[in-house]
Amino acid sequence: MQSFLNKLIPLALTVGTGLSLAQSSMYTVDGGQRAVIFDRISGVKEKSVGEGTHFIMPWLQKPIIFDIRSSPRNIKSDTGSKDLQTVSVTVRVLFRPDVEHLPSIFSKLGLDYDERILPSLGNEVLKSVVAQYDATELITQREVVSKEIRESLMKRAKEFNLLLDDVSITHLSFSQDFTNAIEHKQVAQQEAERSKYIVMKNEQEKKANIIRAEGEAEAAKLIGQAMGNSAAFIELRRIEAYKDITESLSKSKQVTYVPTSGNLLMNLNKQ
């Protein structure tokens, strides 16, 4: 029995050692990842390794796993505008490493390449672009500013083998004094527009009254001319007046109209 145990122990140690070596000689690269191989003798290998299970030489080689999917990051910078206003701007970037240059990225920057590059790079670009615009231009030309920041950041990041899939301004604010000044200016503009509207309205009403008065005066003038120049019109007005008098007399109970040649009116109810 003791002899059997003495033989079993070395065998178990051999098998265990073999399994350990086999396990340490294998590694897996998941989806959305790449591996860079570091060799203790030759250094970082020039080619990155794709997805799947791969073999390495235990102890001599070590896989460094990179996530190559796009990752978000916010970059904030407090800077100054062209007219010396304090500006706080934050941009959101979606970044990923250039797969073709992973060995170089690891050799020069390491796994935390984004932490080493993006904050300083973003701060540099934001200060440079914002300084070209006045505070009001940063508001009114936000799309232009955002485009310039995006193009500049992408260009600079590419120098470090970083790819930016998207860059957008998420926050843009100014000092409290400038904000208050903008609000006061907007209120003043609204009041000016309101006053302008009231003046225009009064002017229109004044013009309308003048036109109406001129029209009425012209109409009265034309009527006067017609009355003075038209005998038929005068005769018509005389007949209408005579008709009104006749109708008024016919309704009176104390007056009788006698159609004689003298057109006499006689009071029949003399007291």
Swiss-Prot record:
What keywords appear on the UniProt entry? Coiled coil, Membrane, Mitochondrion, Mitochondrion inner membrane, Transit peptide
CDD domains associated with the record: SPFH_prohibitin
Primary location? mitochondrion
What are the coiled-coil residue ranges? 201-221
Per UniProt, the transit peptide runs over 1-24
Please give a single GO biological process term from the UniProt record: mitochondrion organization
Q: Which InterPro entries match?
A: Band_7, Band_7/SPFH_dom_sf, Prohibitin
Q: Which GO terms describe its cellular component?
A: mitochondrial inner membrane; mitochondrion
Tell where it localizes.
Answer: Mitochondrion inner membrane
Top-rank taxon of the source lineage equals Eukaryota
UniProt membrane topology term? Peripheral membrane protein
The UniProt similarity line reads: Belongs to the prohibitin family.
PANTHER family (UniProt xref): PROHIBITIN (PTHR23222), PROHIBITIN 1 (PTHR23222:SF0)
User: What functional role does this protein have?
Assistant: Prohibitin probably acts as a holdase/unfoldase for the stabilization of newly synthesized mitochondrial proteins.
Protein's name in the database: Prohibitin-1, mitochondrial
Organism of this sequence? Dictyostelium discoideum (Social amoeba)
